[in-house]
Amino acid sequence: DTSPAHAGSDRIAEAIRYMNRHLFEELSVQEVAASVALSSSHFSRQFKAKTGYPPYEYIILRRIDKAKYLLTSTQLSVKEIAYATGYNSEENFIHSFRSNVGIAPGLFRKHPI
């Protein structure tokens, strides 16, 4: 199928693969959009239409999922998990985790929800 809708869907699938490969690195929506030859605004609209999430929220949610796994399956410190999941500081990680999960990472480790 070479329809524009199919081509757009292929680009979003490729963007998701790109995001997953670079998830724990510094990653911007502009960089992901450029990787599939789309403008940031067009990419963001297409991505949300296909996934239900804006691109940056998708990145955050994937990072939080990985952090939950690391918190419950390793003895890594919260700081180590912050850096391992692509955050540039422990404070940013804690804020993001609390905003998305509802509790702090340390408490999640003790009482996973």
Task: Give the ranges of each region predicted by the language model.
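Short, structured helix-loop boundary elements
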Residues: 5, 9-12, 29
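Basic/polar phosphate-binding segments, predominantly the helix-turn-helix DNA-binding elements
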Residues: 14, 18-62, 76, 82-107, ...
